[in-house]
Every structure is written in C-alpha cells, then in structure tokens.
Amino acid sequence: MYQALYRKYRPQTFSDVVGQKSVTDTLCSQLETGKLSHASLFTATRGTGKTSCAKILAKAVNCENPNHGDPCGLCPSCRAIDEGSCMDVLEIDAASNNGVDSVRVLRDDAIYTPGTVKMRVYIIDEVHMLSTAAFNALLKIIEEPPAHLLFILATTELQKVPATILSRCQRFAFKRLRPDEIASRLNFIAYQEHIEIEPEAVNLLARLADGGMRDGVSLLDQCASAANGSVTLESVYASLGLAGEKRTAELMQAIAEQNTAKALTILYSGFPKAICLHRSGWINMPVLMISKREASSPPINAPHSVTTGSISVTPMSAKKARVSSGA
C-alpha cells in the first residue's frame, strides 16, 4: 500500500525536526541532564511538529543508546515504539476519548510499572477536547505521578486547557514555520522521491502550507501524483484548483482601469465557483476591496476609490477608517 509522504518523512529524531530549534534544544538538554519534567504540554497550530516531537521524546526516554538526547532508532525499544507495538507508550486521541471513564482507566493503569521499557509514556493529543470531569480525573495523576510515568499533552487551543493542568506542565510553544523552511524540506523530499519540481512551484506550495510542514508535504504529494512526478507552477494551479496569481493580477488590473465588463468576464471565466480565491492570494491583497452598492447611492468619498457602475473599489485602510469614525 502506498505510504503518504508526510508519514514516510515524519521526523525520527530531534535533529530532523525543522524550525523548532528552541524546543528541540531544550528537550535534548533536559534529557542529557536528567531534568525532564514528568508532564510536558506542546502547543501550536496544526502541522508544526507537536505529535512528531512527542513520539521522538517517548523514544528518547526509553532509548538504550541515546546520542545527545536523540534516540538511536535502532534499539529494541526505539523499534517497538516506531512500529506501535510497545504497550507502554500509548497515544490517545482526546477528541474521541474525552470522557471521564477513559481517563479513569488511564489513571488506574498508570500505577503499574512498564513491562518492556524504562518509562511508561502517555501522549494525549488534542487534550483541550477533554471534558471538565476528565480534566479533574487527570489532574490527580499529573499532580503526583509515579516515577516511571511521563505525560506529553498536545493542543491547538491552549486557552481551553484548565489553569490547574497548565500550572503542572512545562509548556513548549511550537512556532509556525517560515515558507523558506518549508520549501527547503520540500526540495529535500522531492529529491529523495525523484520528483522534478520547479522552484516557483516549491515556493508556492510553501506559501500555501500556511506555516504547517505537514500541509506542505501533503500538497507536494497531491501535486506530484497528479503531475506524474514533474511538478510545474501551472500543474500546481491545476492540481489544487487555484485561480493563479497571473489571473488574479489581470482581475486587479481590470478593476484599476475601471473596466467593469473586463473584470466581470475575467471573474466568471477564470474564477469558477470551484476555484479557491483565498488560496490564490486574493485574501492577501488588502489594497482593494470589491463591494456592491446601489447604482443610485452616492459615491464613496475615500482616497483613491474607483467607482464603475455597480462596483466600487476602495482601499481597505479607507474602509476601516470610515468604520472607526462611524461614517
């Protein structure tokens, strides 16, 4: 069965993690000095490496031959965790196991010492989805954990995690990745997979990933499959259903020229309903805003506004100024 690229190229060591050096360096230092907290909370938006780092940390604390905090990936413990056969390292999806009964079972099992590895590790993903009663049940075991127990919590919505849980965890804030960091990783994966890809296409995919490495790799996977291994800028537009920056520029030019007919022609011919204007860059153009108004209404008195028929093009800054002044 085909393995998705984001799974195939998931980081296996802290050194493989892209763009989260402050987090990985701290974890490696704690592992080397033996000062790792019994409970860690990873927080960030999707696709930034929270779950990957949690699994790497689970391997690192149980690795028989660690290297400066990184797991070796070759010992029986590392291999069992990678294969998902280690019964002492459990990944729990709080979205589907958010009740108090699930947490009580976890709490009761946590007191037993691990059978095959040094530390029993619970990775609770999307922990903010737990119910209030479940959080209360979890609080006691996090407050007074056995020496063999490690909790790694991950969330995309930190504000929903109770303060009583937050105060008992070490927090690690993962950052959104820069486009150049994502592009570098995409180029590496493309080289490994013998995918020919244009630099412009890589840069576009990196921007569309919106700070998430997993999204970027998934987009590359989708485009490479559709383009039979040769990814161009145009093939990315076609594969992802994007309007394209050139088409968007043509629309902007027509609006600036007050050519309503041309603008509408481009809009309806180049941007069918299935096309995503948001991802093509339209939403990132704050200079112009199209608004419908009655033909008989007075013109908008804003600097540099353009009025043609029933379409008015106004600078976004001017629009905000009118709203704030009550105009």
Give residue spans per PLM region.
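P-loop/Walker A NTP-binding region and its immediately flanking N-terminal helices
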Residues: M1-R171
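Extended, largely alpha-helical regulatory/partner-binding modules appended to the mid-to-C-terminal parts
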Residues: V23, A80-M87, V105, K118, ...
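Low-complexity, glycine/proline/serine-enriched flexible coil segments
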Residues: V287, S305-T308
